[in-house]
Amino acid sequence: MSETAPAASSTLVPAPVEKPATKRRGKKPGMATARKPRGFSVSKLIPEALSMSQERAGMSLAALKKALAAAGYDVEKNNSRIKLALKRLVNKGVLVQTKGTGASGSFKLSKKAASGNDKGKGKKSASAKAKKLGLSRASRSPKSSKTKVVKKPKATPTKGSGSRRKTKGAKGLQQRKSPAKARATNSNSGKSKMVMQKTDLRKAAGRK
């Protein structure tokens, strides 16, 4: 009996099942920029608009809305916010309601709020002036830092030295002229002596 080798059992290895790639939800480009920027706070815009008005009786709600719209605030969408802000500001004492009731009527700044706005404007203007002065000084400083070559003035002869020189020259001229005068006087005196002698001789001859 020939022994037959057992046939190698063919073992089938199951292929690895690939899991479907799960897509991660990433932020879409432009999502961060798509968010609307925060609008201006109405509680700050209303006092600023009222401070610009020069009406003693206050500003009406319609005029206030026009001023807010001119400042870039969306009045139509935020109508309810404007009314709530007006009520809050009146309760806090920032605004005074001169006409009407509730959110309708006319409003103006209280004396305390008006004085605070004036002080803030004064501080801002003073700081702006200080900055301008600092810039102007800084711009002028490089020019002044340049060393200027100072030319030495020529020594001008003083009047005293000139007068001294003139007096010295005059004295020298007088000294030079004086010998000639002395000679002239000597010659004149000699001539006069000769004349006197001649006259004496003539007188003596006449007497003889």
UniProtKB/Swiss-Prot annotation:
Composition-biased stretches (Basic and acidic residues): 199-208
Domain H15, chain residue ranges per copy: 38-111
Any one annotated GO CC term: nucleus
PROSITE patterns, A to Z: H15
Post-translational modification: Phosphorylated in early spermatids.
Key words, A-Z: Chromosome, Citrullination, Developmental protein, Differentiation, DNA-binding, Nucleus, Phosphoprotein, Spermatogenesis
Protein name in the entry: Histone H1t
Source organism (scientific name): Rattus norvegicus (Rat)
